[in-house]
Each structure stands twice: as structure tokens, then as C-alpha cells.
Amino acid sequence: MNNIIDGKKLAEEIIVKVKAETIKLRNNYNIQPGIAVIIVGDDPASQVYVASKNKKAEECGFLSIKHVVSKETQEKELLQLIATLNSDPKIHGILVQLPLPAHINTNRITQAVAFQKDVDGFHYVNVGKLAANALEDAIIPCTPAGAMMMIEQHCGRDLSGLDAVVVGRSNIVGKPMAALLTAANATVTIAHSRTRDLDDVCRSADILVAAVGRPQMIKKDWIKKDAIVIDVGINRIPAPEKGVGKTHLIGDVDFENVKEKAAAITPVPGGVGPMTIAMLMVNTLKAAARLHNLPIPKF
């Protein structure tokens, strides 16, 4: 049965619309959305993520700038760079690639980004707007925003009468995911690795979002029949069959077994990951429109 949600396909559909809206902005208002990505140090995984973000931004017709600074960069210097980007009218979105070196206060850095340009949705102003259900005015974190679009594709935008369980309580995924589901009228439970009888809690879910960071933690017998299962987990594990030192990605869900029971399920990779980058493009486009007091494109 074809119950696998194709994140790549849905993401490309979104990117097509972003490109069209970008052309409108340029033709009608002479505005080119601009995104600046800051990367501290030379972490290989971060380099790969940033390269994919820059490539997608350029594909969308955005101005895309990458600032690579050494891992010895001091917090004060990083704050100065952010202040410069905050005041640059050509830049509408600022993203600081995480993780940061231990000597830099991550929270201080993320909160230094102007909330209007905070395309990650981490600033307290955007967090508060999401919590207050001011979704039209908030910048929503990319991963939960993408996951929500996948859920809407199967369940519609009104989730009244459906029980949703979010396994994971991070500020980046779990909490904003729960807020989005609540705003869509689902009855929401936030669970985590220390939740008592977690398997029973998961079995109550019509919609299950796994974002706990534990490989294949969610088993087939934890899933209600015909549930929608969104796997946000990205776990890199050894794959010796591919060669010495090789790895592969798996999610928080035991995909091969759970897919036999779920009505719809996202794979890892190829599920939520492509949607996260697509929603970063959406957030940047919307930020550009908002900063110029123009109508906000709908997605």
C-alpha cells in the first residue's frame, strides 16, 4: 500500500510556489528576498546543511549570503555581525547554524537576531505569538511548520475530534508542534522519554509526532491502527555494511514495521527533512513581505 508521505515531492510543490511569489515581489515591488546564514567553525554536518540551504535559496531567486567564521570567534564578534545583518535592508532572514561552540551562549545569540528576521522562529517574540495563536503574525519554526503541512495534506486544516500525541518537548520541535496542533483544534498530549506508560499514551493517538531523538523508539504495537505518523527524528548510526566508518540515517520510528499499521507515515530520510528547508524558504519570503508591509503569501 502506498501510505508513505513523500516529503521531497511536497517540498518541491512548495518551492514552486515560493519561486512564483519571489518573481511577483521582484517584478511588482523590486524586492528580492535575502537570507544570511552564519556558520561558526567547520563542523562537517553543519557545512552540508548550510550548503543545502544556500542552494535552495538561490534556486528560489533569493539573495543568499553565507558568513563563515572561525570556531575561535568570540561571542561579542558574533553579536556585532548579527547587529550588522539586523540593520541591512537587503537581508530579510537571518539563520545562525547550530550547534555553536561551547564558549558562546546559544540563547544570547538566537535572541540577538531581530524577531522580524528570525526565520528559525526561535526568538521569544515569535515563540510568544505562536503560543498566543497569532499564527498569521508569527514566524513558525521550520520543522514543525513542515510537519504540520504534511498532517494537513491527510487530515485537512481542522483537526477537531482527533487526538494528537507529540513525543518530545524541545523548544525547536516538540513545544511548537504541540502549539500548532492545538491551534488546529486537535486534543494534544505532550509526552517524552520519561512519560509513564509511554506506549499506552502513543496508542491513543490519531496523529503521532515522534521528535525524541531515540532511534526506532516507536514500535508497531505502540501505534493505533490507521494513525498518521510523522517521524521528526534524525539519528545517524553506524552502517558497517557500507564500509568502515560509514553511517546511515534512521528516525525515531521503527519505519518498516510501523508502516504496515499506519494510514500514513513519513520516511527518514526523505520525509520531514526536505520540508524543513522548504519552510525556511517560506519563512524568508514571508519575512520579506512583512518587512515591506506587503500582503503575506499564503501556503
UniProtKB/Swiss-Prot annotation:
Keywords assigned:
Amino-acid biosynthesis, Histidine biosynthesis, Hydrolase, Methionine biosynthesis, Multifunctional enzyme, NADP, One-carbon metabolism, Oxidoreductase, Purine biosynthesis
Instruction: Return the Pfam families for the record.
Output: THF_DHG_CYH, THF_DHG_CYH_C
SUPFAM superfamilies recorded: Aminoacid dehydrogenase-like, N-terminal domain, NAD(P)-binding Rossmann-fold domains
Name the pathway.
One-carbon metabolism; tetrahydrofolate interconversion
The UniProt catalytic activity note for this protein reads: (6R)-5,10-methylene-5,6,7,8-tetrahydrofolate + NADP(+) = (6R)-5,10-methenyltetrahydrofolate + NADPH; (6R)-5,10-methenyltetrahydrofolate + H2O = (6R)-10-formyltetrahydrofolate + H(+)
Any single GO BP term? L-histidine biosynthetic process
Query: Source organism's superkingdom?
Result: Bacteria
- Write the Enzyme Commission number(s) for this entry: 1.5.1.5, 3.5.4.9
- Which residues of this UniProt protein bind NADP(+)? G168, R169, S170, S193, I234
Q: Can you list the GO cellular component terms from the UniProt entry?
A: cytosol
InterPro entries noted in UniProt: Aminoacid_DH-like_N_sf, NAD(P)-bd_dom_sf, THF_DH/CycHdrlase, THF_DH/CycHdrlase_cat_dom, THF_DH/CycHdrlase_CS, THF_DH/CycHdrlase_NAD-bd_dom
A GO molecular function annotation here is: methenyltetrahydrofolate cyclohydrolase activity
Instruction: Give the matching PROSITE patterns.
Output: THF_DHG_CYH_1, THF_DHG_CYH_2
The UniProt entry, under NCBIfam families, shows: PRK14186.1, PRK14188.1
Recorded hits in HAMAP family, A to Z, give:
THF_DHG_CYH
| Similarity annotation | Belongs to the tetrahydrofolate dehydrogenase/cyclohydrolase family.
Q: What does this protein do?
A: Catalyzes the oxidation of 5,10-methylenetetrahydrofolate to 5,10-methenyltetrahydrofolate and then the hydrolysis of 5,10-methenyltetrahydrofolate to 10-formyltetrahydrofolate.
**Subunit structure as annotated in this protein's UniProt entry:** Homodimer.
Task: Indicate what this protein is called per its UniProt record.
Answer: Bifunctional protein FolD
Give the species: Bartonella tribocorum (strain CIP 105476 / IBS 506)
Gene of this entry: folD
